[in-house]
Design a protein with these regions (language model features):
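Glycine-rich, basic loop-to-helix element that forms the pyrophosphate-binding segment
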Residues: 2-18, 39, 89, 93-97
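Conserved nucleotide-sugar donor-binding
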Residues: 19-20, 98-109
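The conserved acidic donor/metal-binding loop of glycosyltransferases
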Residues: 27-31
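Catalytic donor/gating beta->alpha subdomain of glycosyltransferases that bind UDP-sugars
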Residues: 113-176
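Conserved donor NDP-sugar-binding/catalytic core segment of glycosyltransferases
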Residues: 34-67, 141-142, 146
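Short, flexible, basic/aromatic active-site loop/helix in glycosyltransferases
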Residues: 54-60, 69-92, 107, 171
């Protein structure tokens, strides 16, 4: 038996007692397709990498809300593709829900920071990149990622992610990119549009256009399922407001301490 050190401690312990050239790190709520290991081997044979990761998607058996949340977390129109989409607005940082890394690199970097409650995987990926190691996105190395089953749970999850981004910015100021600020800008923008719309109702059209974009894109991705399309709009707003408010609150607390 080992003491419960959370996900980071467990992963670090597993890495220390492991053997082999590469480590595969996965979340407990992920399901692997049958071809996962074959895809990893094929991708590494084609392109060498010190660390790599792949996208996550929804399994056909997932319920409607899980599929909607999966859309919100992976769509280019909500995340800029930074979670592993083929289109992305930022350098690729492997995430712990689907990550591979050379064992010697993991040991040399001392693994995950066990003092961090949230954002420890981005912290680790940042140290990988700053250490001069290569990271690669392997689109074929995907996992089915089970999501929350309630929007309030999802809100709290992404709220913590927004807070973690500010904690990471304090450690690595140069890692904060425009794409990370977009949810906060979205929150302020939506509130501003709602207030200004009282005087100029046509401004609501801007918000409506974004809603329609999300609805059409999500409905198309889920083969014409209108219900999932509607839920995806709700999930997208939950994701953006959760991350955005967490980001703003953590930023405000940080600035007040200065």
């Amino acid at each position: 038996m080992i003491p419960n050190g959370g996900p980071s401690g467990a992963r670090n312990y597993g890495a220390r007692i492991s053997e082999g050239e590469y480590l595969l790190i996965l979340d407990s709520d992920c399901i692997l397709p049958e071809t996962y290991l074959e895809a990893v081997e094929r991708s590494l044979n084609e392109t060498e990498a010190d660390a790599f990761g792949g996208p996550d998607c929804a399994h056909p058996s997932f319920n409607a809300i899980q599929k909607a949340i999966s859309y919100a977390m992976t769509s280019f129109f909500t995340t800029g593709g930074i979670r592993g989409g083929k289109k992305k607005l930022d350098q690729f940082y492997p995430r712990s829900f689907n990550m591979g890394i050379r064992r010697d690199v993991f040991i040399k970097l001392d693994g995950f920071d066990t003092s961090m409650r949230y954002g420890e995987d981005i912290d680790f990926s940042t140290r990988i990149i700053q250490g001069g190691y290569t990271t690669r996105l392997f689109p074929e190395v995907y996992v089915y990622h089970k999501r929350r089953t309630r929007l309030i749970q999802f809100f709290r999850q992404v709220e913590h992610s927004g807070e973690a981004r500010i904690a990471l910015t304090q450690k690595y100021p140069s890692t904060l990119k425009i794409v990370h600020c977009l949810p906060a800008v979205f929150v302020i923008g939506v509130i501003g549009l709602c207030l200004l719309g009282i005087l100029c109702p046509w401004l609501y059209l801007l918000l409506l256009l974004y809603v329609l974009l999300l609805f059409i894109d999500a409905t198309y991705q889920y083969k014409g399922n209108i219900w999932i399309g509607m839920l995806s709009v709700a999930a997208a707003f939950t994701q953006l407001f959760g991350y955005g408010t967490g980001f703003i609150r953590a930023w405000w607390k940080w600035k007040l301490k200065k």
